[in-house]
Amino acid sequence: MSMRSALAFLRIFSALLALGSAVPAAAQSPQPSARVVLVDKDNDGGYRTTTNRSYTGVRDRVIKARMLERLRDFLSPVRLPRSIGLLAAECDGGDDASPFYHSGYRTITVCYQFIVLVETITDKMMAAIKKDPKAYPFPITREEFLWGLIGGVLLHESGHALFDVLDVPVFGREEDAADQISILVALHLRPQLAEAAVKSYAYFWHTVPDPDSGVKNGKMNEDFADEHGTGSQRLYNGLCLGYGHSPAVFGKFVSAGWLPQARAKGCAQEYARLESAFVRTVLPFIDTKKMAEVQAVDWLAANYGPAQPATAVTVRNTPPPAATARSDAPPGGQGPVGRGTP
C-alpha cells in the first residue's frame, strides 16, 4: 500500500494512534482466536448486576444502548495478537470511579458511576451554555456533549489497551498518548461526529480548574506528580489536533481565543506527525474488509440515537464462553472492578 493510499485509508477509518516507533507489525503474529470480547459472568452479557438502586437504571440504559457490543464492533477491524475483554460494572472508588484498562487481565471496565457523573456534567454544561452562549465558540446539543464525552473516554481507555496488546512503545506520558488516540480517532469519523467529539472534549476540559502551583509548607503541590496533564494542557492539546486536521472547521476556537495563535501555528505539523505514526505502526494491523463495515456506521445514531435501531453492523465474531478473554482470568470471568482515571 502506497503512502498516499495509506493516508486516504486513515481519513475514512478511526482506530488508534501510536507515538514513536514500534515493533514491526510483521514481527507480531495475530492469533485467529484473539479478539475483543465481552467478559461474561452468569450470563450477564458483560454487564455486571448491581443491587445499588442508584445504578440499576444506568445498567438498563447501557444495555439498551449496547455500549459494550458497539465498542467491540468498533474495534473489530484491529487484528489482535492477544484478546481484550470488555465489561461494565459498579466499580470500587465511590461516585467518581471512571473507566479504566487493567493490563493484568487485559480488560477495559466501564463504571456505572461514570455514566451518572457524565450525565450530571452534561446537565451543568447545557445550563452554562444556555446562560451565556456567546462564551462558547460552537453550539452543541445535549446528546453530542454526552456521548462525545463518553465515547472519548472509551477511546482513551481503548488506546491504553491497544498500546499494551500491540506492544507499542510510547515516548512521554502514556496518558497524553491515549488522549491523542481519542482525538485522532474521532477526527476520522463522520464530520458531525468529529465536530461533536472535539467540542465536547474542549468544553469539558475548559471547566476543569488547574491545580495550585504554589509551594505550601515547603512542599510542592503533588497534583503535578499525576500521570495526567492539567485540564488546560489537555484542552490545548486536543484543540491543536482538531485545528491541525481541519483548520476551516475548528478555526473559531483560535479566533475566540480558546487556542492561542502561537500554538495554532504549529498544529498542522503536530497533527501530521501523529498521522504518520499511525500509518507506520498501526495500519498493518487493520483488516480493511471489516474497516469498510465499521466506517459505514453513523456511530452516534446507531449507538445512542432515540429512534435508531442498533443493527447497523453485523459482526461475525461470536463472544466465547465466560472469561476466555484471557486464560488466567479469575473464576467466573469477574475481571477487575476497581477505580480508574481517564
Question: Predicted regions: what is each one?
Answer:
Residues 57-82, 118:
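Zn2+-dependent metallopeptidase catalytic core
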Residues 34-59, 162-166:
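Acidic/histidine-rich, surface-exposed loop or edge segments in extracytoplasmic proteins
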Residues 171-189:
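An active-site-proximal "capping" alpha-helix that borders the catalytic cofactor pocket
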Residues 133-152, 166-170:
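Short pre-active-site segment immediately N-terminal to the catalytic Zn-binding motif
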